[in-house]
Amino acid sequence: MNKVWLSIACSFLLLAAGALPSRAVELRIGRDALERTLKQQLFAGPNGRFYLKGTPSSACAVYADDARVTFIQDRILVKVKTRARMGKSVGGACIGISLSPQAEVSMAPYGEGESIGFRDAQLVKVSDQRELNFLLTPFLSRQVPSSMKVDAADLLRKALESSTVSSNYKVTLDRLKVHSMQIKGNTLIVDVDGDISVK
């Protein structure tokens, strides 16, 4: 994801170097970058798992892993594999049922000041088991969208700081405003404007 933000930072640097007034610029964020963000922020536990119930050492536990992000029309679809051992723990074993359904949620991207957020979460596919859905529904509709939120200004500032070392120019992002976004193919195109200083 750092390469994406470094190229974005270079775009801003070119605008600043040309002494142009603040105008809208397009940030292009690939599907893979959003998927990495989700995995880093939510699936950072042991073996890339997020435990909805229990822990890695629990006999009975429910976890999600293997998150995949795809773009469909104007929405972002997140698919996760769910593994559930539901029942009663007896002598270190889970006596009950094992389930491994795939769950899906779609959401719409939107601009939120300096950030790219996600809202209007709609459950596309969940389990047939009511007990499992009790855990999956809040996870998919709240935790997944909030974990995909990207602070664009913060990432650009970090990319600009690293460019200062190689260029000997102090480049800072003073302001960033996300206006609108749309999905084209495997890219989320974000219209932003901002101010950059070069010293």
Summary of predicted features, one role per range:
Residues 1-5:
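Positively charged n-region of N-terminal signal peptides that target proteins for export
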Residues 6-9, 30-32:
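Short helix-onset patch at the extreme N-terminus, typifying the N->h transition
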Residues 7-17:
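Bacterial N-terminal signal peptides
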Residues 16-24:
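Bacterial Sec-dependent signal peptides at the C-terminal "C-region" and cleavage site
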Residues 23-199:
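Extracellular/lumenal and peripheral-membrane lipid-interaction modules
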